[in-house]
Swiss-Prot record:
Organism: Photobacterium profundum (strain SS9)
Name of the protein: Isoleucine--tRNA ligase
Protein residues bound to Zn(2+): C917, C920, C937, C940
Main location: cytoplasm
Gene Ontology biological-process annotations: isoleucyl-tRNA aminoacylation
Length: 954
């Protein structure tokens, strides 16, 4: 055999079998950076139709986690696929840089502003801290193979961006959507600031559940409303009963709300002589009366009379422990789902309470300070923290005989997303974007219908949120944030009449010096001494959701890279329906009257292999850095693309191992292609399609069909579909059939002969397509493959430096449907081959043959199938990987044959008695008959020193 080894076309390539991605990828990244890959893409696509995926900014604090990796890789895959589809698709990564988490990190080191540092110095420290965090995260994202304008990202703290955020506020005000009000807002006592809806998360909490009695001022007048039978009006005090889980809000109670159309009952609670308890009467919703009595442990009671809630309007009841009385008011928010049907109303501590309070002119009492402590003038509770005061309030109610019942109650309660601590509703002076003042809610709901939501359920989700959302509280009482750069009248608090002009002047200052320019500004510099005497600066800062929400203007509309185009796609986690998607929508409609995006695509959260949330305490956290250091970024990227990311996305060591296995299959397929292109020059060696061996044309046709499906999947953001089709192509169509069949021809045919060159032509065309399909997902590996491919593209042109600057390969072709050996023909041949393989395997197990090339088989088939098999002539044996394959026509199973899965096909398997060729390993009768070449067959002699064998079909 050694004498003939040099006559074989052995595969050879510099593309290694093992990826060693963790070591190789950083080297490739350096090359991408040194040779300005991103800039090369921009040059190549300049002037093409644009596709803009606008990056939702991650927060500049902490290391990136696996959810960040999922998000950034998804974006990168989509952008690279759009680039290959010919779009100019720039990617400008961004960061959210203001806000409390950064303040807290700076406070840990330097203390609160005003102590060791002035406010200005504190802001500078925040800026420096955020910049450092951006750099750390940036390196992590780059390591994932994400291409973008990393040298010039957008940061919400960039002076130009801060200026544009202020301009955005001006536009909102100009369009009459800005509102100043004293309203209850979500308030975190740890932050000392208002929270937006998106900053609130719900967790289970145990609260004191209390039923409280409010005693009627005019008992006879109240009882008269219930139409009791004469002489059966009952006896004892008359009280309306409320239920609440926030006893601390009782000092702010200013009414009891009932529903106008609900039926209410006057209940007589009978005297309990054994416990020295007098009789008394209670008012509750009729539907809930039994529940209330059961809860309070009242066994002896009966109903005295009924009335509608509307009949009780404005009847007055004594506050449980203060010396004033409160009215009964009507509210649509009152239900009979729980409680008593009579709702404790504190307009300073609840949105619905506030609305009812406005309607009835109730006092908006807020006895609680920003730190959650009752103000000094709060009777009975001054100086106590509200949550600690719950027990004190309960005791006070007991002392006043107003507590009907008390027990611990577990329920879902709003918490601060940063501190994970319970929050309160607290009325404070705040700035709002009004949802209804100028029709913003209705316009936003209309615009939602003009957007494509992927998955479709995203539309109903965000519609429900916009329909039900309160006014957007955009003001914060913080130090590190973009200022609400407005001037208000010192007495009336009205906006300055020249607000539009003043906003632009402030924005220009901030553009030069950053947000500190606002705090350093003397109002007289902008408006003159006379106006400055009457107007003052607003010292609140903007909600960071406003910062990121207006990037459709501050970034997309402003960066020259986008050429004035608006965003085609926003892509974030599904939690952003209540976050960035909504803040972007509301601000864009408020500013421009239209949605900021054409499509919104969401992905789910990452969970572990058992579906559990990632948690350090559980020990199931998968860090992107650990994966790239161990397996490489391409494995992580393939994992992302292989998942159905629209739902929860599972990751674990085992799941990543499966991705690594899939990666190896794809890599080995690519390596086979490259290794067998050894010695192939596309400029001189390409075979014309019509002259190619039929099976080679079939293989190129399979690639053409795969490419159509893959591009369609990429266009639909169906990355799971891309990887499935890619795996099917590599493992099934190529690995299990085509590549298996062509090894004999590729290795043993005459070097440079038609049989070999036809095969290499197919391999060349297929790998040209394959490397592009891979590029968006396995970017590093695609780049590696690209650099091992022939320098020429076969059209007189040299290959681009990078696969990412080109477009999908357009040189594929397939078999025509009217050809005898069309796709349907080869599909049937594969079925026959599969059936034969099963029988060969049995023959191997039974030791009839050693390997398939030792087999001589006869295929007994019906006339139709036999005719198809015979079209392959002597080349049928190459398809079946046997040394001999004969076809016989039969309608019944011959003696000694075996039935197969293919209808009408029976097969006889025998061991060949012919000698084995040392070169091709086929068992052929003429081995040993050719002088000078006694060890090989005649076919091999022809391929070594003759014209070379002729192959037409396989």
């Amino acid at each position: 055999m050694s004498d003939y080894k040099d006559t074989l076309n052995l595969p050879e390539t510099g593309f290694p079998m093992r990826g060693n991605l963790a070591q190789r990828e950083p080297v490739m990244l350096k090359r991408w950076d040194d040779e300005d890959l991103y800039g090369e893409i921009r040059k190549a696509k300049k002037g093409n139709k644009s596709f803009i995926l606008h990056d939702g900014p991650p927060y500049a604090n902490g290391d990136i986690h696996i959810g960040h990796a999922l998000n950034k890789i998804l974006k990168d895959i989509i952008i690279k696929s759009k680039t290959l589809s010919g779009f100019d698709a720039p990617y400008i990564p961004g960061w959210d840089c203001h806000g409390l988490p950064i303040e807290l990190m700076v406070e840990k080191k330097w203390g609160k502003p005003g102590r060791k540092l002035t406010a200005a110095e504190f802001r500078q420290k925040c800026r420096e801290y955020a910049a450092g965090q951006v750099e750390g995260q940036k390196e992590s994202f780059i390591r994932l193979g994400v291409l973008g304008q990393w040298d010039k990202p957008y940061r919400t703290m960039d002076f130009a961006t801060e200026a544009n955020i202020i301009r955005s506020l001006g536009k909102v005000a100009e369009n009459d959507h800005l509102l100043k009000g004293f309203k209850p807002v979500h308030w975190c006592t740890d932050c000392g600031s208002a929270l937006a809806e998106a900053e609130v998360e719900y967790q289970d909490k145990v609260s004191p559940s209390i039923d409280v009695k409010f005693k009627a001022v005019d008992e006879a007048g109240v009882v008269a409303k219930f139409n009791c039978a004469e002489g059966h009006e009952g006896q004892g005090d008359v009280s309306v009963v409320i239920w609440t889980t926030t006893p601390w809000t009782m000092p702010a109670n200013r009414a009891v709300a009932v529903r106008d159309d609900l039926e209410y009952v006057l209940v007589q609670v009978e005297a309990d002589a054994a416990n020295d308890k007098a009789a008394y009467r209670l008012i509750v919703a009729a539907e809930l009366a039994k529940d209330v009595m059961d809860r309070a442990g009242i066994e002896h009671f009966h109903n005295l009379g009924f009335c509608k809630g509307a009949d009780l309007e404005l009847m007055r009841f004594n506050h449980p422990f203060y010396s004033f009385d409160v009215p009964i008011v009507l509210g649509d928010h009152v239900t009979t789902e729980s409680g008593t049907g009579c709702v404790h109303t504190a307009p300073g501590h609840g949105q619905e309470d506030f609305v009812v309070g406005q309607k009835y002119g109730l006092e908006i009492a807020n006895p609680v300070g920003s730190n959650g402590v009752y103000l000094p003038d709060t009777e009975l509770f001054a100086g106590q923290h509200v949550f600690k005061a719950n027990d004190v309030v309960v005791e006070t109610l007991k002392e006043h005989g107003a507590l009907l019942h008390h027990h611990a109650y577990e329920h879902s309660y709003p918490h601060c997303w940063r501190h994970k601590t319970p929050i309160i509703f607290r009325a404070t002076p705040q700035w709002f974007i009004s949802m209804d003042k100028a029709g913003l809610r209705a316009k936003a709901l209309g615009e939602i219908k003009n957007v494509q939501w992927l998955p479709e359920w995203g539309q109903s989700r965000i519609e429900g949120m916009v329909e039900g959302r309160p006014e957007w509280c955009i003001s914060r009482q913080r130090t590190w944030g973009v200022p609400i750069a407005l001037f208000v009248h010192k007495e009336t608090q009205e906006l300055h009449p020249d607000t539009r002009v003043l906003i632009e002047k402030v924005a220009q200052l901030v553009e030069q010096k950053g947000i500190q320019a606002w705090w350093d500004l003397n109002p007289a510099e902008l408006m003159g001494e006379a106006d400055a005497a009457n107007y003052e600066k607003v010292l609140d800062t903007l909600d960071v959701w406003f910062d990121s929400g207006v990037t459709h203007f501050s970034v997309v509309d402003s960066r020259e890279e986008y050429n004035g185009h608006s965003a085609d796609l926003y892509l974030e986690g599904s939690d952003q329906h209540r976050g960035w998607f909504q803040s972007s929508l509301v601000s864009s409609v408020a500013m421009k009257g239209k949605a900021p995006y054409n499509q919104v695509l969401t992905h789910g959260f990452v969970v572990d292999g058992q579906g559990r949330k990632m948690s350090k305490s559980v020990g199931n956290v998968v860090a992107p850095k650990d994966v790239t250091n161990k397996l490489g970024a391409d494995i992580l990227r393939l994992w992302v693309a292989s998942t159905d990311y629209t739902g929860e996305v599972a990751v674990s060591d085992e799941i990543l191992k499966r991705s690594a296995d899939a990666y190896r299959r794809i890599r080995n397929t690519a390596r086979f292609f490259l290794a067998n292109l050894n010695g192939f020059n596309p400029e001189t060696d390409l075979v014309a399609p019509e002259e190619m061996v039929a099976l080679d044309r079939w293989a190129v046709g399979r690639a053409m069909e795969a490419q159509e499906e893959i591009i369609k999947a990429y266009d639909g953001y169906n990355l799971h579909g891309v990887t499935q089709r890619l795996m099917q192509f590599c493992s099934v169509e190529m690995g299990s059939f085509y590549l298996d069949v062509i090894k004999d021809r590729q290795y043993t045919a005459k070097q440079g002969g038609h049989a070999q060159r036809s095969c290499q032509t197919a391999l060349f065309y297929i790998v040209e397509a394959l490397v592009r399909w891979m590029a968006p997902i396995m970017s590093f590996t695609a780049d590696e493959i690209w650099n091992e491919m022939p320098a020429s593209q076969g059209n007189g042109e040299q290959r681009d430096k990078f696969v990412f600057t080109g477009e999908w390969f357009e040189g594929l072709f397939g078999l025509a449907d009217d050809e005898v050996m069309n796709d349907e023909f080869w599909a049937e041949i594969q079925q026959v081959r599969g059936a034969v393989n099963k029988l060969l395997e049995l023959a191997r197990k039974d030791k009839v043959i050693g390997g398939s090339l030792q087999a001589e088989i006869t295929l007994h088939a019906n006339e139709t199938l036999a005719a198809k098999l015979n079209t392959l002539e002597d080349e049928l044996r190459f398809v079946l990987l046997t040394s001999k394959a004969a076809v016989a026509i039969t309608d019944s199973m011959p003696e000694g044959a075996q039935k197969t899965d293919v209808e009408g096909l029976f097969v006889t398997v025998n061991a060949s008695e012919a000698a084995k060729c040392d070169r091709c390993w086929h068992h052929v009768a003429d081995v040993g008959t050719i002088e000078g070449h006694e060890e090989v067959c005649g076919r091999c002699v022809t391929n070594i020193s003759g014209e070379g064998e002729e192959r037409k079909f396989a």
